[in-house]
Amino acid sequence: MSDAYRTETRESGTMSFRIEWVYDHDCDPPWDREDGHGPVSDWEHRSKRPGEMILDSNRGSHRFYDFAQAVKTARVEGWNTAPFDWPTNGARAHAAALADFKYLQAWCNDQWHYCGIVVTLLDADGEPESVDASLWGIESEGDDYHEEVIEELIFECMHEITATIGV
């Protein structure tokens, strides 16, 4: 695949599989696809208002994170973040909103992205077979979760093989 940024081959029993991590360009920004984030504006050409933080900038336009509203939401919804033992609800909400801002800012700064993991069965010559499985919309920074996904996708491929040959 042309957008694969990492590829490796793994063995499972007598079978070989190619594992590809592929940029998922079809994912919406995290604040549009997931709950639990503070309000983020569209691109706007204006100055920051009180209670806002600049999340991202490009050619004089900005996306603003409504930090004041995020803290209010965090308090009501019980958001939390490490170290998880904040002395007050206000401190917890403030820290959680700040962690949310940093998480979203990291996405804006390409410090993480969404990806797809594609597992493809390889023949004895290392060429791809028609059996594959994939999962998309995964955060790029989740190696433990990636391993779980890879194991499940290999299992899915093996299940497809056994279903095809009737074993």
Could you describe each region identified by the protein language model?
Residues 1-167:
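Acidic interaction surfaces
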